[in-house]
């Protein structure tokens, strides 16, 4: 109720040392037992962070901020480090005043496939905000936005930029207001891809994703560059001499990835040679 009233009345919280400008939010490593005002309410909260790991560093962790505790099990190559970044209110409400603090524990994963577990502390409570498949130290923070680089496995392994936003909302449950906080990815229209492969069959290309007019055909046995993709269904390809360029359709919703060739969905391994995937 306090937060809803604050938003409706456009009141500001007292500024704290943890508050940061949207342009220069700083990621900090948090030690077990650290204390501070992590939600801008004028009181001090203590952080307790403990991991339980086996000889392979697999296991779980427990995070307590103030009087709220969360736990996570079944992590792979779990780190003992905890990071946090202050999240200010949007300027529309109260510029630079502290909305809360995003805490991040993380695992390195089975094959350098990191996952950060994100928890948002605000108004005296700790909320599960979701995950980001990147290390906290590989992220940049701009208010409620987080920018990083993610791994993609469409027609090979490559990296793409990603932006996440911390969403928030309120709902009435009985006589009380419930708060919700969750990270969601902001999709891009297309991403730079930059992989080179070789065709096993002729590959027709079309002019655009919405115009199926022919843009030419890559011959069988020819090399081509996957230049861009929406990371869902469309890949923009170009012949090595740059004379033929256009789009083709893929479906990666299941294994194996399928490529549309002359109206027929065909396994990507039957269409392309030398697709490079990391383990």
Q: Where are the language model's segments positioned?
A:
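Short aromatic loop motif centered on NTY/YTY
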Residues: 83-121, 125-196
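Beta-loop motif signature
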Residues: 186-245, 257-279
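Sec-dependent signal peptide cleavage junction
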Residues: 14-26
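Acidic, glycine-anchored loop motifs typical of Ca2+
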Residues: 36-47, 55, 93-104
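Positively charged n-region of N-terminal signal peptides that target proteins for export
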Residues: 1-7
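Signature of short aromatic-glycine-proline-rich micro-motifs recurring in repeat-based ectodomains
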Residues: 29-33, 87-89
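Repetitive beta-architecture junctions, highlighting loop-to-beta-strand starts
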Residues: 31, 56-63, 114-116, 159-161
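Blade-edge motifs of beta-propeller repeat domains
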Residues: 23-25, 68-82, 130-132
């Amino acid at each position: 109720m306090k937060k809803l009233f604050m938003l409706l009345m456009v009141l500001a919280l007292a500024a704290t040392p943890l508050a940061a400008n949207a342009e220069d939010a700083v990621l900090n490593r948090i030690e077990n037992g650290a204390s501070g005002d992590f939600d801008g309410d004028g009181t001090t909260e203590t952080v307790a962070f403990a991991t339980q790991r086996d000889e392979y560093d697999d296991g779980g962790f427990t995070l307590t901020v103030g009087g709220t505790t969360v736990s996570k099990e079944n992590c792979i190559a779990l780190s003992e480090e905890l990071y946090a970044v202050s999240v200010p209110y949007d300027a529309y409400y109260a510029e630079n005043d502290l909305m809360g603090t995003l805490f991040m524990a993380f695992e390195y994963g089975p094959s350098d496939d990191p996952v950060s577990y994100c928890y948002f502390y605000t108004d005296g409570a700790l909320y599960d905000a979701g995950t980001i498949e990147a290390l906290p130290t590989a992220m940049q923070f701009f208010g409620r936005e987080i920018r990083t680089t993610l791994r993609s496995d469409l027609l090979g392994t490559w990296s793409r930029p990603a932006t996440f936003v911390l969403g928030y909302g309120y709902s009435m449950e009985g006589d009380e207001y419930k708060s919700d906080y969750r990270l969601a990815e902001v999709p891009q229209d297309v991403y730079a891809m930059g992989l080179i492969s070789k065709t096993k069959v002729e590959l027709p290309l079309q002019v655009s994703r919405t115009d199926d007019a022919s843009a030419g055909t890559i011959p069988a046995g020819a090399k081509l560059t996957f230049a861009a993709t929406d990371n869902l269904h469309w890949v923009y390809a170009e012949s090595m001499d740059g004379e033929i360029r256009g789009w083709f359709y893929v479906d990666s919703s299941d294994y194996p990835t399928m490529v549309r060739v002359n109206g027929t969905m065909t396994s990507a391994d039957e269409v392309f040679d030398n697709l490079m995937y990391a383990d």
